[in-house]
Amino acid sequence: MTTPQLRPQQTADRLDWLAETLDEFAPFEAAQRIAPHLGAQPRDDGCVEVGFWTPALVEAGIPAEDVSLEMFTPTESVDPSAPESTVEFDRHRVPLRREGEYHWGVIEGMQIGTREQLGSLYQLVYQKRGRKVPGRDDSLDRDGWGIVPDPLADSVPFGVFAPAECYDIERLDADRADREYFEALGSDDERVSTSEHDGLPRVEPAVSMLEIHPSTATESGSLAGLARRYREIGRKQRDGEELTPAERNFVGYDAIQVMPVEPITQQHGTHHFWEPGEFDREEASETLEVRVGRPDMINWGYDIVISAFAAPNPAVLETGRPDELVDFIAACHNLPEPIKIVFDIALGHADDGAIPLLADEFFEGPGMYGQHLDYQQPTVRAILLELQRRKMDYGADGIRVDGAQDFRYYDAERDEMVHDDAFLAKMDEVVQEVAGTEYRPWMIYEDGRPWPQEDWELTSTYRTLIEQHPHSFQWSPVTFAHNTPALLTFWATKWWRVREVADMGSQWLTGVANHDTVRRGSQVVVGDSWDAPQENPNLADDMPATLDAAYNNPASSMLFHCLLPGVPMDFLNANMRGPWGFIRDTDDTWNVKVVAEEAYVVDWQLTDETFVDDRFFPRLKSLGFETREGLREFIQRLADTVEATDYHLETMATVLSTLGTPMGDDLSYKDLKAFGQAWMADMHEYANLSHWTADQDDDRTAFDLAVREFRHDRPWLRRDVGEADSELFDYRHPTRGTVLYYGLRESPAGDEQLLVAANMEGQPVEVSPAILAEDEQIPDDGWEVALAAPGVDSEAGTDAAVVELQDSQAIIWQREP
């Protein structure tokens, strides 16, 4: 292969274009035009164009001739999926050219990555010569050289703290298996509905949606594993073969919201995926060995570092190839009934791990989740929007903007933080292009403003961005983290919010099961004192079964899928009645505190039987925890010491040693950190849904699927209750020990009426159309049972039949007016 070198004339041409752009346009407009060209982009002539924004180097006076592109090209075939290997690389360093705050170059001789081969790895380096670059974290620097990673990288097979990979994204698009799906958008042949918006097709909202966490959804914990799962489901559907009970939990939806698949931070004391041997950076080229490994960080996906945001998280790539993300999307698009993919885009914050990866201009200062980003800085603003565009161009049909209320900036005149709604509007304007087709995605905002204002739970309307962007959707008030349906009186005290869903929820995401709510439900402390929260005793006999029954609940499922407006969303782990909690091993500083906050997961998610199961908790058992009760006692004491010592690890270890622990009576802070790591790794494995596949109940999963299909047969249910004069939604009051919701819906054509009654919680209650008609203007004849929860005796199927609904049971009657 050709030795990498700078092509002077081609580089000069690009610098001329760069200078003209900077001179002709205002800062933000110029940055918008430049951002699509940043990173490493293969050209038609076989060269690679490389561009970096480096304001700190320019401000510090680093001479242009001291700035180079450093490349590592493998001399042999590399398997990025290997847990660990030693690879020989040819290293080359090529000087770049400067224009304004940018360093640029057209490079000949870089190896371009594909599905089959690892491309050249690269990063920007500069000679420090004893100079300190103000405002720049230098923790990545080595041997008198500064290192600047590429924040617009397309592939980071060994993590964001390793050099990025030069990757052929255009080939990935050209070879995707769902090109026809995108080519048909906006035409009579489209497989999913779109509507015209500013001259382009905008993907229409889903009927219902499933949220999936890739690293616990399948045995492999990878996007490749999910692609295999949906390809197999598609094969069975085409062949008329029955799905297994577990497979049913994946279908019945026309959209999937994937929890974030962006590169995340790493714990530097534990995660070592790129370890070069000795080499001399002064040399322009040499050969060296590097120990590399497939990243295996554990995380929900929200601890992102912004850098390489456009690339897939290598920890969810089985092969280390970005193609896996496209393969998964294509598998869903090519199903007999296509499933749309919604990306969970978390650009509202950056983990502290981003500090050495990004220019200081990216940060406004510390925030609730690490670093608050500076959305007002023109180039940062443009780069963030470009990162969104590139990521969505993998083929997403929709975008969920995580924590939209966190996109804020400081207004000096008002002396307060202000919501940057103009930036959120820019996010909505981004146009995607896949397979040569331009389109706009379905837009969803998670926005709970004025959170974290003290009275946010009362004052949040969850409609601000819908009012600004009438085509957009938001998460509903019953979908946010603070909803805990396993607690007694939840459905009584949340009635006012559920009623809002009925009245104005047509553009809300609804449902009470998602990654946030199940976690919050597992953290609730219940007790025997008169003022302590109380779990609903009617759901199940123990707390783990109670939690499962609360989030995979026939009554609430029928409520959201068969009666109320909006787009109901379920959570795969809840569908499977599998474990879930806050899992991450990427934070050495706060890991023990995070584990302490999960103390009551032992009560809510573990049983004596599951703890002693040889499949689970091997690391905790190796530390001395032989019983669930021993673990429960220790972790609750750990939580108490966090509060008592203000999270001083050494003092915590001393206090716990005095009390005695299964780990011994002479603990150090290192022992507590080891416990935290063991907890996270064991909980991650425990939550993998492959362990719970055989436990899926045939009748229950068949019913759950029937509920979702009921919604899909009646997409008109998405409109608000009350658009037809006959429609209503209410609850029986006084409750008399039972929270009974009921409602009537009528199709737009007037050819079908549905009557729903649901015992949301409480004592058994008798219902029938005639009984409900005693208090409401409901027709009392012509009703037949359309769907009933398991256990409801509805065989008679006539309007005269009275049925008894236990807690969490519901029934739907149907009639033709």
Segments from the language model and where they lie:
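Carbohydrate-interacting/catalytic domains
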Residues: 1-210, 223-238, 254, 547-558, ...
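Catalytic domains of carbohydrate-active enzymes, especially glycoside hydrolases
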Residues: 205, 229-265, 270-272, 280-302, ...
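Hydrophobic faces of well-ordered beta-strands that scaffold small-molecule active sites
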Residues: 208-212, 256-258, 341-345, 399-401, ...
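The substrate-binding groove and active-site-proximal loops of carbohydrate-active enzymes
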Residues: 213-224, 303-322, 366-382, 404-421, ...
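An active-site-proximal structural segment forming one wall of the substrate-binding cleft
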Residues: 234-250, 324-339, 375-399
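Aromatic- and acidic-residue-enriched carbohydrate-binding clefts of CAZyme catalytic domains
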Residues: 268-323, 330, 351-379, 386-387, ...
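Active-site neighborhood of glycoside hydrolase catalytic domains
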Residues: 333, 350-460, 517
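Conserved alpha/beta catalytic core and glycan-binding cleft of carbohydrate-active enzymes
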Residues: 435-630, 643-660
